[in-house]
Each structure stands twice: as structure tokens, then as C-alpha cells.
Amino acid sequence: MSNSIEAKLQEDLRDALVDYYLGQIVPNSKDFTNLRSTIKNVDDLYDHLLLDTQVSAKVITSRLSLVTQSVQQYINRIALNLEPGLSINQQEATDWEEFANRYGYWAANQQLRMFPEIYVDPTLRLTKTEFFFQLESALNQGKLTDDVAQKAVLGYLNNFEEVSNLEIIAGYQDGIDIENDKTYFVARTRMQPYRYFWRSLDASQRNANSQELYPTAWSEWKAISVPLENVANGIVRPIMMDNRLYISWFEVAEEKETDSDGNIIVSGRYRTKIRLAHLGFDGVWSSGTTLREEVLADQMEEMIAVVDRMEDEPRLALVAFKEMSESWDVVFSYICDSMLIESSNLPTTTHPPKPGDGDKGLSDLDDYGANLVWFYLHETANGGKAEYKQLILYPVIINRDWPIELDKTHQGDFGTVDDFTLNSNYTGDELSLYLQSSSTYKYDFSKSKNIIYGIWKEDANNNRCWLNYKLLTPEDYEPQINATLVMCDKGDVNIITGFSLPNGGVDAGGKIKVTLRVGKKLRDKFQIKQFSQTQYLQFPEASSADVWYIGKQIRLNTLFAKELIGKASRSLDLVLSWETQNSRLEEAILGGAAELIDLDGANGIYFWELFFHMPFMVSWRFNVEQRYEDANRWVKYLFNPFECEDEPALLLGKPPYWNSRPLVDEPFKGYSLTQPSDPDAIAASDPIHYRKAVFNFLTKNIIDQGDMEYRKLQPSARTLARLSYSTASSLLGRRPDVQLTSFWQPLTLEDASYKTDSEIRAIEMQSQPLTFEPVVHDQTMSAVDNDIFMYPMNNELRGLWDRIENRIYNLRHNLTLDGKEINMDLYDSSISPRGLMKQRYQRVVTARNASKMNFKVPNYRFEPMLNRSKSGVETLIQFGSTLLSLLERKDSLSFDAYQMIQSGDLYRFSIDLQQQDIDINKASLEALQVSKQSAQDRYDHFKELYDENISSTEQKVIELQSQAANSLLMAQGMRTAAAALDVIPNIYGLAVGGSHWGAPLNAAAEIIMIKYQADSSKSESLSVSESYRRRRQEWELQYKQAEWEVNSVEQQINLQNMQIKAANKRLEQVEAQQQQAMALLDYFSERFTNESLYTWLISQLSSLYLQAYDAVLSLCLSAEASLLYELNLGEQSFVGGGGWNDLYQGLMAGETLKLALMRMERVYVEQNSRRQEITKTISLKALLGESWPAELNKLKQKTPINFNLEEQIFVEDYQELYQRRIKSVSVSLPMLVGPYEDVCAQLTQTSSSYSTRADLKTVENMLTKRTFADTPHLVRSIQPNQQISLSTGVNDSGLFMLNFDDERFLPFEGSGVDSSWRLQFTNLKQNLDSLNDVILHVKYTAAIGSSTFSQGVRKILANINNDE
């Protein structure tokens, strides 16, 4: 029956079954009672059966395939919530989508889980730190050597040292569940200029049994690329809001003011800014944003930052404060929503006004911020202050007189209470309330002698219940009443306090309603403590005894990095030694004996990378570069199966063979749960997988090393290859026996679901019972455990045994690596000293075989290889130019950044100079003001003297002097009168007498004296008057000079004020320039084309450049090999090994190779002379003679025959020729071939040789078949085992068209005519009865020797013929 008819019948049967199912089964079957309304057509049937009932017969399927597709469809529908009543959680849906809903993905994922060691690749590790990426970049920038590796490791250690001993300044716990929350830390370097970093701790990533944190619980330290030079007190606070990390800080700058005289004075006020920055999802920090800026009277000293989630919309509260006393503080805050918009509808807070609130004028914003959260400072044992913060309920105190309203029918009944206080305190999960009064109760009741006062709680429906109450009588004095409210969650609590009559129920008559805003207090708090030089994280003493973190301490810093740097500068062996890894140099947290470095602690990720991932990656790189000896040497830092029994490290407790602590320390089982499909995570969880990976790598590397030696086709190299394979076989041991008999019994899924794993059950019976935990989805665990499914064979490991066995088999049967037969010398050919020198400097493997007698012949001739090499060299030169431009650009950016940094330093220096200039000017101004005051005092003094002129005392003295002069003149006048009277006789008697004759003269003298006295008095008066006048003139001069001096000093003061203003302006200018320079530096640092980008580009291009150099060098060496092969130039070398210089990033390597190509081209043009072109036809029947019938019989039986084309048959034709090399070989088969019938035969050249010089000794050895040990000018078997397939049997060269201008070498081209061959017919059914001969058409070239050489060859032939 044809396929089309059968397909039509199958489709008709399908349609009939569908119609029957819809028409009979669905309407009549009890199983479809509830489904009849939903299954109406084939589409409904598809939704029910999850099978396409309209599929055509062209679709190839099976029952099992259909069932699998149906189940897959079913689970997909559950994941999409299309199956009523069935659903899976988000994690299960994600796992199903990523790993399980496609068989290919599921199978690959299972392979990753079962055999992670196979897929461990150090270059593809997902959890590399930024420092490790930089180490990789350094290793990729040039030829990988020990010096390069040491430099890269030193760079890694320098980076690690910077973050190993950071000062942690803040932390933020994102939530209130200390067991599972993420905590973010901010730290800074201990030396200026400060650099800030952040990291996180995920407390949920811990071992289920030991409760120890996994190393991956800690993220790496990452730099905060935000300008933080002006951070006040070094305080930076992290916050997590809306799944985004923020940092907040505040900046304080003292305000400067100018007085009325233009002087710059300190105002005592502080410009304060609250700033915020966030980490973008691309890992780039935003520039800082100023949220609030004001000038405050107080200098803020501390800051806290929290997210308040008590409302529907979370609020970010940033509170800067200054502690004024033990009971109150000054705050400066910013409260905003998740969009950073300042909140205006803040919740009402009720608390007492703090001292000074009215004076300070705190806003509602500050009022909310002051009471939302608060902090405590506690004195530590060593005198330091350790701060920790908690959300608390601020104490609420209300003082009020409350009227008592009784039932309205009781008119006139009332009372008052004075000085009533409601206090609250939040402790643990309890809200304690108490009513208190400091005065007596006053009430006047006419009808009721008792009254109830108490505390009620009101729910959302205004229903009230008693918390506590007291029954009072007029005689009672009840100072207080207490009540406790157990809190279940944060939120608002309505409390009602008041009075009621005894029969008034729970309704408070006189009442006041208070809404208390309650926040959950964080009872369990992290604390960052320091003991000596050790900084550690102190977990709290939990209230519950079964909490894992009770009193736990985790070291945060390490001082081990400096020790590592010191060792790395001397030798990498010291860094990676077992002694270093087990050094007890870590100071104990609370004193005591020193501790080992913690591989699983806060710095464990760095120690893992240093002691394991780094040497593994370097050895991996060496293997990729085919430098297997270096790879073996580096992998010994991890695993050395060849170590001596007296190894000193064994005495230190090192386990045999293993040299890396991360591979032998007891791991935290279950770490793989965090990344169940990551082979590195699985291996880190159980390092036996890492040990297997290292073991497999070492074994493969040894095999690869053996393969490299095997390809050299030298006897000694084969010996080394055999040793490598034996070593790898010894490491693997015997191949495990596998039982091929299968006892599998088919099972249904239902039966399989009831099978259990007996071994797991036995382990469970032996284990201690675990604490019951709620069942959650775990993608690492199977839904059903049973023992009917087993792990498959590790084909990768089994392949190593197969590979070794294949290599050993080929060695034992004289085959090449790919299984072809070869003929080899008994001993190696000698290597020239030049070749040995070249071997030391060549980079690629193809250039390491210094002897050009054993190089691999390229596929292409010299001219096409030259063109390809030129193209590759031009590309390499372009790569080098691009690399140089990138290096120049990076250096330019580095120089610009350096200039900017230096400019910043110079600006700071200029600012200091300007400030000193201002201080000098201010001092000069003060001196001028003193001088002005002195001049003003002199002016005032002399002006006062001038205005006063003669004092009253001096005037009185003048008057007295005038009176004295007048008195003296009167006395003199009286004396003159007396003298005149003396002339008159005063005796009257007998004689007249008694007169004095001299009296007139005396009188005259007295008159003269009177005149003298008068003149003298006048002159004295005039003298005094004139002296006073002169004195006044002097005073006038003095006060005028003082006035001029005051004016002059005033001008100088004005000039000095102008200079101070100018200096302040210059200072502002320099500060603005500094800010602009810093902003420009920040722009240069943060822009995309920054220095780090060029560093990355240089790293990537350096790696590409090195690989391009390897590729182009291989092309050039192939071109060189083609040239040497074509022109038979022997051991000449054109491509040197010094083209690449690691010191200069390999620049000019392309130009060096270009010069080598030009030299090769010149040699090719000069020496590519035309050779003799000869064709020789050879009959195997004639060549083999008597043995031909037997050989012909072998051919007819499809058995291969071997024959030789000896040098002698060619020498007999032309004695003056040498260097006979085959150009092409074609075969003619004289036989009858039917129409459309082909010949199927293979011709293989097993060996060949030719002489390179016209040397008679070489010719004699070739003709006499003597040993070739003393024949230096003989080339043997350059490219053995070349083969052609014959199809026509008529001058058949094995090619569709024989083209002597082909870019590729022709089969057998360049080999010697002195050769060995193997011929075989391969078609077992072909009739060869008509075959009677095999004709070879050999076309070869040869060089012409001298006549002397020709005569010598003839003599050798004559001697051979005579001997025969």
C-alpha cells in the first residue's frame, strides 16, 4: 500500500474517532457529567486531552512522545494559571520556565548538577570580583609570564589591601528580621584623601545546619564614585528604598558676613545641606542632589537615615542633629516620599515641646523627624562611643483639665481634675500607659458618691474595652493608674482616658482621645565594634534562645594583606605556599591566640580568589596557549601528585598532594542552594568537585603535552609523549568495570511515584531530628525520591581513558596522531645552534620546532601565503596603531586628571595664600585703626588746647603779674616822692638843716627805676602773651597735623578695606575655580569615555592584539615554511623571535613581520630560478620483474602492495642532476572497464628522500642504501603518508583537473623521487582480472650540478654495476 493511501486511511480513522468521542463518549460517559457544557468541538477536546486531535499523518510521533508533550503542556498551563484550582509559586514557575519546560535545557541543567567538575571554567566564573577582573585584564595585556603574573597578583593585593582594613562608618538593615534581612555597610579608607566603599550582607544565605553564613552572603567592596570631599564629620549613611541603594550625608560650612564697615566677620551660623545620591541599575552612581539647604544657628554633628513604612506610602527620613543635652537635641531633617518629593501631610505627633522649641522655630518637618526615630550613644569598655539606633515611641505627656460630663438627666453633676498626665512607654511588644496627677482631685457630686476613671482602647469600629480602671470615692487620693497594651504590629493606637459613673458601662463620660503613633522597636541590633586593630560585627543577644545569631561575632577587616604584599614582592611561591595559607596572623576578636585567615568570612571571597581561582586561571591560560609545562607548574600550587614524601609542608599538617586550603577545608554544605545551576557554586559548596576539576585539568594538560610531543614525529619526542600518556594513565588508574547487563523493568509513573530511596531512608534513621520548618519550594530537590533512577556515566572522564588508549595504540603501531602510518628515523636529526636560539624566542608552538627538517609543510604555495600574510600583517599594524592611540589617549586623560588634581592642590594652596593675605590685610587694618585712633586723640587734644587757648589759671597768673607790676610802680613812685621830700629841710631851729643833697638824684634814679620797672613789666607781659600766642600756633599746627593724619589714615583704612574686599573676591574666585576644577574632574571621572573605559579598551585590545600577533606570526611562519619548501633553502630564517616586546606592549611587531615578508619576497624573486622539468614513465611490471605476478595477485585480491622508486633509476637517466623532487604523480591502469564504471584504488607515499646539494657522498649513500646518520644533505619524509584516490585509471592524478598553477601544493609535490609507495584497490566487488600492469607517470624537477659532479656520479654507478 502506498504511503499516501495509508496516510489518508489514518486521517480518516482519526476523524472517525474524534467524532465518536464527541458524539458518544462525552454526552454519555459519567466521567464527563461536569464537562459536557465545555467540550463542544475539537478545540475544546484539545484543551481537555492536551493532545492535538487534528494532527496529520505527516507528523512523526510515538506514544511516549505524545504523553511527554501532554504532561509538558499540562504543567505549562498550570504555570499560566489556566488550570482551575491548580497553581505553582513564583519560584517554581521561574524554574520551570528557565530549566524544565524544554528537554534540551533540562538535560543540560541536569548535567551541570550531576557533573559540575566537567563544566568548571575559571574564565567563565560568574562571581568574579572587580579586582579579579582587573587581574584578568592585566594577564591578558601581553605574553603571560611569571613576571606578568607576579605584577598582576601585586595589583590584586594592592586593591585588596585598600579594602581589607576599611573603617566602617555606617550600616543599614533593610527590614526588622535580622535572620533574613540584607544589611548594607559604608566604609572609608583610613588615610586621606578618603575613598568610600559599600558592600552588603545577606543574612539569609547561611547553612541550614550550622547556621554559618556562606561566603557569598558578603558582596565585594565596591567604590562609591560620588564626590564626598565636603562630608561633615565623615558621616555617610546608606538607605535602601524601593529596591535601590541610596547614600545620604550632610555638609556644613560656616557662614561669613560683612559688617557695616565692609569687614569680613564670622557669623556663628552654618550653611547646612542634606544631600542624597543613588546607585543606578547600571551600577553607576548619580551625582549628589541637595534636598534641603538652610543657614542654622547650630552646627549639626550627627545624622541618621531611615525609611518609615508605617504609612501606605513609605517615607524617607534624613535627620541631622546636634546633641544639646542628655534630654533634647536640635534637628535638621528632610522627610520625603519615594519620589524624593518633600512630604507635606506628615502624621500628627504629640509630644512635649522640647526646651527651646519656640526659640528655634522647628518646623513640622523637624518635629516629625525628631520623633520618628532616635538614637542612643553608649560608652564602650575602652572609652569609645558605640552608637546604635532604634525606632521608638516618643514619650507622650498631656497636661489638661478635663470636665466630667455625666448622664444628661443628672444635671448639675460635674467635676474637674487638675494637672492630669498621660504617659506612655514602649518596651518590647508592650505599650505601657499610666495616668498620673500631682494634685488632689476636686469634684462635687450631688447624687453619686463614687466615680470610675480609667483607660480604654478603641478599635477601628469605635468599640471600646477596658485596659484598667479605678473606683474613686471622695475620700480617695489615687495618684496614678497603669495599663499595658500588647502590641501585635506597628501602626496607630487610639487610647481614651476619662471618667465614668459606676453604672455607666465602658463609655467614658469625661474623655479625651489620644492617637499614639507606635513603631516597632528594633530589639535585635547589629553593632560594629573594635578590639585593638580588629573591627568586627557584633550580633545581638537575642531574646529567644533558639536564634542562630546569639552573640555571634564576625571579623570585618584583616591585616593579612600587608603580609601578602611583602611576600608577593619576593616570590609568588611564598604567597601561595601552604605555610602562608595557614599563618596565624589574624588578631583574635577579643584577644587571645592569633587565628587563621577566615576563608568563609567577610573577606573570604578575596582569599578564595587569591589561593585558588587565580592559580587555576593562570594554569588554564597557559594550557590554552599550549604552554603545557608552565600550566603543570602553576597547577602544582593546587594539586601536586608528584610531591616527595619528605615535603616540608607535610610536617605542617598539609594533606598529601593538595596545596590549597580552599580545596581541603570543610565546606558549608548547601551553598549550592543559592545557585543550583552554577557549577562554581556547586563546587564551592562541596570542594570535591573543584578537586575533580583540577585533577581532570592536570590529566588533560599532561595528555595535551604528550600530543604536542607526538606531533613532532621525532623518536625522542615520541618517547616523551609515551611518558606523558603513562603518567596520565597512572593518575587515572584502571578503567572501572561497567556492568552492561540491564535489569530494568518497565514501570508506570504511578508505580514509580511510590518508590523510595532505601539509602536515604537509612540515613534519615541515623540522623538527629531537625526542627520543623515550613515546606517551601527547593529547586535543588526532586519532588519524589526513589532509587530506580541512577546517574549516567561520566562520559568526559571515560573519554580520558579512551584518549590515552588511542594514543598508546597509535604509538605501538607506528601511526601518527590521527592514525596514519609513518616511517621515522631511528634517531633525531641534530638541531642547529641558530635553531635552538630561535626556539627560545618564538612564541607560538609551530615555531618551537627549531629544525626545519621536521616542520609541517603548509597547504599553500609561497605566493598565496605571502598575500595572506601581508593582509594579516596590515591588520596587525592597524591593531598596533589603534592600541598606541588608546595608550596615548589614556595617558592624555591620566595627565589631564593629574593636572586637575594638581590644580586642586594648587587651588588649596592659593586659597591658603589668599586667606593669609586677608589675615595680613586685616592685621594691617587693625594697625591703621590704632594709628587713626592715636591721631584722632592728638587732634582732639591739641584742638581742645587751641580752642581753649589760655586757661583760667594762666589768665589769673597774668592778672596777678599785672597787679604786681602796678604795685611795684606805685612803690617806686612813693620812693621817688620820698626822695623829693628829702630835699626839704626837716629841722627848723637855730639852723636850717636835715635835708639830703643827694635826694634829687635819688629821686631821679627812682624815676628811672620806675620807668624801668614799668617797661620791664610791660615786656614780661608782652613776652607771656606772645609765648601764649606762639604756643597756640604750635597747638594749631599739631591739631591740624593730627587732622591731616586722621584723614590720611582714613584713606589708608578705606584702601585697606578695598584690599580686603578685593582679597575676599580673589578668595571667592579661587574657591569658585577650585569648585569648577573639582566639578570638571568629577565630569572627567564620571563620563563614559573616562580613563577606566580606555583601561578596559586597552586590556581588550591588548588581548586581541596578542592573539592577532599569534595568528599573523603563524601565517608568516607558514609563508616562511612554504618559501623554504619551494626553494629548498634549508635552515634559513626570516621571521625572528624578537618582534614582540612585552615591555612595550608588542608595538612595532607588525612592522617587524612586514620587514620579514619583504625579505622573503626578495629572496623568492632572486632564487626562484627555473629547474629541469622531467617526466618519467614507470611500469611496475618491469620494475618488479619476477615478483610482479605475486604482487599482481595481491592487487586482484584487494590486498595492498608496497614498492619503491629508487634514486638509481632516475640517476641512470641524468647523472648531472640532483635535488630531484616530485611535481606530480599520475597512474594509468591497463585494464578493461565497463561503461559507467570507475576504478577504486588508493596510492600512498609512505616515505621519500632527496639530496639538497650536489654532494657525491650523499648520492653514494642514496644509491647504496647505507645509513643516513652521516648524510647531512639529505631530506627524508617531510610530509609522509600523502595519499590520492584513483577513479579513472587513465593518467589519473587523483584530482578533478591537474593544474600546475594551483595555489595549493599538488599531491606528493616537493617530496623526493627516491620514495616508497603502497597501492591498494578498495572496491571489493570490482573485477580486476583484466589488469596486467600499473603505469606511473612521474613528473619531477631537478637542479643541474657541475661536470665534476656528473663524472663522480657516473663513477659511482659504474662501481655499483661492477659490484652487481
UniProtKB/Swiss-Prot annotation:
**Cellular component, GO, one term:** extracellular region
How is this protein named in the record?
A: Toxin subunit YenA2
Any Pfam family matching the protein: Neuraminidase
What about PTM? The isolated toxin complex includes 3 peptides starting between residues 768 and 778 of this protein, which might be physiologically relevant.
Has UniProt tagged this entry with the keyword Transmembrane?
no
Coiled-coil annotated spans: 1025-1080
Instruction: Indicate where this protein resides in the cell.
Output: Secreted
Q: Organism, per UniProt?
A: Yersinia entomophaga
